[in-house]
Amino acid sequence: MSKRPGDIIISTPVSKVRRRLNFDSPYSSRAAVPIVQGTNKRRSWTYRPMYRKPRIYRMYRSPDVPRGCEGPCKVQSYEQRDDIKHTGIVRCVSDVTRGSGITHRVGKRFCVKSIYFLGKVWMDENIKKQNHTNQVMFFLVRDRRPYGNSPMDFGQVFNMFDNEPSTATVKNDLRDRFQVMRKFHATVIGGPSGMKEQALVKRFFKINSHVTLFIFIQEAAKYENHTENALLLYMACTHASNPVYATMKIRIYFYDSISN
């Protein structure tokens, strides 16, 4: 049986032990002696340098700077505390002020490469004493054609069965305008036993969304100034009578477009 040049077989007449020293990638060719791997193959290459990874990881690595953009990577943070109800609320997370700083956009076009949600969902003293389970649904939505002074409400965008946010889907006549890019949830539990009065939210998503705002707006960064691809965060809780609070820090990482 043919063996690779990186394989060394050690055989002694007493112990009859066959060992392989594998210096090559497990994806290059089939092994002569089976390998017992205790970890996932995909995770085994995570902490290795790029030149020691298989060819598939070197060829299809995503670029650091999105196509059509230029560095440096800029950061915009939003700190907010919201009262999340069963009917839902909405926040615009692509408001970036125009300027020359590391947190400003240069022109009217920029690309949001990734977004980071950090914070917690919690209940007040009166609500956490009641026996109930409440889940907060988060929808990161892209509005391709923003219109009006404020975003559309949760009930105007999503179609729900029996007004339940866990069954929310974008309405059929709005599917070409609103796109759900990411969806996640957090759970809190109230009651004397098994209480979970707060839940941490820590999510990082790569989205690569190109946002366009009006060019003549010098400082204001609002939803009404968007012309293309506004990023909206819709939030709603599943319990009808017990609202929850969300203390969030939302951070977007974006690049300026070269067509500004």
UniProtKB/Swiss-Prot annotation:
It is found in: Virion; Host nucleus. A motif (Nuclear localization signal) lies at residues 41-55. GO terms for biological process: symbiont entry into host cell; viral penetration into host nucleus. InterPro entries: Gem_coat_AR1, GV_A/BR1_coat, Viral_coat. It comes from the Viruses. GO terms for cellular component: host cell; host cell nucleus; T=1 icosahedral viral capsid. A motif (Nuclear export signal) lies at residues 102-123. Gene3D superfamilies: 2.60.120.20. A zinc finger (unnamed) spans 69-86. GO terms for molecular function: DNA binding; structural molecule activity; zinc ion binding. A motif (Bipartite nuclear localization signal) lies at residues 3-20, 202-251. Keywords: Capsid protein, DNA-binding, Host nucleus, Metal-binding, T=1 icosahedral capsid protein, Viral penetration into host nucleus, Virion, Virus entry into host cell, Zinc, Zinc-finger. Its main location: virion. Signal peptide: none annotated. Encapsidates the viral genome into characteristic twinned ('geminate') particles. Binds the genomic viral ssDNA and shuttles it into and out of the cell nucleus. Plays a role in protection of the genome from degradation, virus acquisition and transmission by insect vectors, infectivity, and systemic movement. The CP of monopartite geminiviruses is absolutely essential for virus movement. Homomultimer. Binds to single-stranded and double-stranded viral DNA. Interacts (via nuclear localization signals) with host importin alpha-1a. Belongs to the geminiviridae capsid protein family. This is Capsid protein. It comes from Tomato yellow leaf curl virus (strain Israel).
